[in-house]
Curated annotation (Swiss-Prot):
GO terms for molecular function: glutamate racemase activity. Substrate binds at residues 14-15, 46-47, 78-79, 189-190. The gene is murI. Pfam families: Asp_Glu_race. The keyword Cell wall biogenesis/degradation applies. Keywords: Cell shape, Cell wall biogenesis/degradation, Isomerase, Peptidoglycan synthesis. The active site is at 77 (proton donor/acceptor), 188 (proton donor/acceptor). This is Glutamate racemase.
Length: 260
C-alpha cells in the first residue's frame, strides 16, 4: 500500500456534534492517525427524520469526506448506522466503513440481574438493526428502550449541565428509578456528553456505557487487516468541518473534543 494512502485521514461523520465522543476515543486509542470530522449540524437531529432522508444525508457526508481524501469512514452516529450503513457499504465497496450500534451485549454481560435502559433516538429504536439486537440479547433480561427526543438539541446548543437539561433527564429517567437498573446504554453518540448528569440522577451503582470503544477497536482491526495503518511517528492532524459553517459550532466542537 502506498505510504500517502496509509497516512491519509480517517473520516468521521455524525448528524452534528455527537460523533466527537467517538472521535475522542479514536484520538486516545490511535493518536498517530490523521482525522477529518464532518458534523451535519445544519440537519440535526437525524433521529426524527425518515430512513430515506437519513440515507440521503449520509451519502452526502461520505462524499464530502472522500473528496477530502479519507481512507476509511466511521459512521459516528447510531441513527445513520441503523438507517444507512448497509447501503453505504454496498455503494462504497472499496473503502472500509465502520458503524456504531448500542452496546447492548456488553451491558447485559456486565451484570447477571437488573434491567438495562437503552437511551437513543426514535429512529435508532425503531430500525430493524435494533430489533435484531433486542431479539439476540434481550431474551432473558428486561431491556427498556427509552427514546429521548429533544436531548440532541440541548447538546448541539452546548447545554451539557444546565438546570434545563437536568430536568429533562430527570423527567425521562425518574419513572424507572423504582426498578433494579443495572446498566444504561447510551445509544446515541451525543449522549456521552451528558453522562455525568445521567450518573448523578441514577447513582454510582448503575453502569453507563456506550459503543465508542468497540467501534474504534473494529476500525483498528479493519485498518490492520487491509494494511492501512498510519506510519506517522508523531501525533496526527485533525480537521473539523460542519455543514453550518459557523464559527460558534466549530469552537464548541473543539471544546467537546477536549472534555475528558
Amino acid at each position: 500500500m502506498q505510504d500517502d494512502l496509509k497516512n491519509a485521514p480517517i473520516g468521521f461523520f455524525d448528524s452534528g456534534l455527537g460523533g466527537l465522543s467517538v472521535l475522542r476515543k479514536a484520538l486516545e486509542m490511535m493518536p498517530n492517525e490523521n482525522y477529518i470530522y464532518y458534523g451535519d449540524s445544519k440537519h440535526a437531529p437525524y433521529g426524527e427524520k425518515t430512513p430515506q432522508e437519513i440515507r440521503s444525508l449520509s451519502f452526502n457526508a461520505i462524499e464530502f469526506l472522500i473528496k477530502k481524501g479519507a481512507k476509511a469512514i466511521v459512521i459516528a452516529c447510531n441513527t445513520a448506522t441503523s438507517a444507512a450503513a448497509h447501503d453505504l457499504r454496498e455503494y462504497y465497496k472499496d473503502i472500509p466503513i465502520i458503524g456504531i450500534e448500542p452496546a447492548l451485549k456488553p451491558a447485559i454481560k456486565l451484570h447477571e440481574t437488573g434491567s438495562v435502559i437503552v437511551m437513543a433516538t426514535k429512529a435508532t429504536l425503531t430500525q430493524e438493526k435494533f430489533k435484531n439486537l433486542m431479539d439476540k440479547y434481550g431474551e432473558h433480561r428486561e431491556v427498556i428502550p427509552l427514546p429521548c427526543p429533544g436531548l440532541v438539541e440541548f447538546i448541539e446548543a452546548g447545554n451539557l449541565e444546565g438546570e434545563e437539561v437536568k430536568n429533562f433527564l430527570r423527567e425521562k429517567l425518574n419513572p424507572y428509578m423504582d426498578r433494579e437498573i443495572s446498566s444504561i446504554v447510551l445509544g446515541c453518540t451525543h449522549y456521552p456528553f451528558v453522562k455525568d448528569v445521567i450518573q448523578d440522577i441514577v447513582g454510582e451503582k448503575v453502569d453507563i456505557i456506550d459503543g465508542s470503544s468497540g467501534t474504534i477497536r473494529e476500525l483498528k482491526r479493519r485498518l490492520e487487516e487491509n494494511n492501512m495503518q498510519s506510519e506517522l511517528k508523531k501525533k496526527g492532524d485533525l480537521d473539523i468541518f460542519n455543514s453550518l459553517e459557523d464559527n460558534k459550532i466549530l469552537e464548541l466542537s473543539k471544546k467537546l473534543i477536549e472534555i475528558k
